Structures are given as C-alpha cells and as structure tokens.
Amino acid sequence: SSSFCQDITLAVGESRVEFRTEIDWHELHRLLKVSFPTILYGEYGINEMQFGYVERPMHRSRAYEKERFEVCNHRYSAVCDGGNGFAVLNDCKYGISMEDGALELTLLRAGACPDMQADNRIHTFTYGAAAWNGSFQESDVVKQGYEINVPPLVINGITDTFSLADTGSDHIVIEAVKLAEDGSGDLIFRLYECKKRIDSTAVKINLPVKAAWLCDMLENKEEEVSVTDGAVIMDFRAFEIKTVRIELK
C-alpha cells in the first residue's frame, strides 16, 4: 500500500551517488532498509558520532553482538580494508546494521506503539554511497557527509568569492562560527579533529586578526595562541575539540 519515487544522481566530477527519495508510507509492523553489500573485509566498521567516530565490530561472534540489531550513526558509516573503502551517507537516518562487509541503512519503520499511525505519511530524504581507494584517513567521507547534509546556499547579488576561514587540513573541521555572547564583537570558532589523527594546523582567518585565545564553553579566555599573518596556529589531538575566541583589529 506504500509507494515511492527516487531520483538517483551522480554529479560530474563527484564520486558520490545520491538517492533523493520520497515515500508515501502506509505500513504496519514493517521495517524498510536499503542494503549495500560489499566485498570489503574490515574487522571494524566506522560510524560517525558527534565530533568524531566510533569503530564497531563487523561480525557477531559475541552474544551481545548477536542481539544488537543495529547501531547509531550520524552523517556516515564506512567499511575499509586499508586499501579500499565504501561509505553510506545520509541526511536524517540514524540506524544502521553492519555485518560481513554489508552496510544496511534503516529508512522507515512501522511500529504499532505508542501510535499505530505515527509514520504513515509522506517522507522525503536523501542518502548516498561513495567509494575510494586508500585508507579512511585518506578519504573525503567526512566532507561528503557535510555536503549531503548542508548543501550550499545560493544568494543573488554577490559576485566575488570569500572564505571566512580555512583550516588548510582535510581532518580539521570548523563546526560553528558565532559572535561572542558578551557583545564585544569577538568571533567564536568551534573546531574539531575528525579522523583520529594528531597534527598541527594553521587556521587562516580572512579578517584582520588582533589576537586569539583558547576558551571554555562559556567563552572565557584560557590560553592565548599564536597568530602569524592572520593564521591561528594550533595543535590537535585525535578527536580533540577546541573553542577559539578571535579578537579583530
């Protein structure tokens, strides 16, 4: 009794296949999943979580793993054998099963409790698939996960290009930028390391920077950091989160 329409697209120059999906869902006691079987052997699968990822077994040899129907993921889940990798991306579907190289994303369910009609309506969502050569750290999966969730905005009237900041690294992510709560006009940047690596990076701020500090969650200054030619120099541990306060000239 359900129907769906799906546009499958592969953009020029991209390695990501997107599945833009609309489903008119009218089911009971049903679960809809999409399966991507692969021939990759990876002992552990990778599931994104906030500010990083967690590795979980791709097998069910232990009792608690056999009872685990699916696990949580955010923007992506991936399997990699060291030389090749495959990832499933999504914009709003957070349950996934992983076993023997297969990634199975849960799209819809039709439970009876507490509301038998809870999901009986039209659903619109997008998921994607991407493959690459090399290790997970060499891939652009994190970037593609952001692209499928935060598409660029098109604004009329602006002809020049401008980037507020650039990390100069494929594994340091600027998660948020805001004005300081104290009304000083300072900028607050939230950054994190996304690929379980240790590195030093120079975050280029394309505004006149006077000084920069590491700060706490309440935006209180804790430690001044070096600024060279408008670039803020910082060291990151694996999955480290940093909040930086930028004072402009």
PLM regions with names:
Residues 1-249:
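C-terminal (or distal) subdomains of carbohydrate-active enzymes
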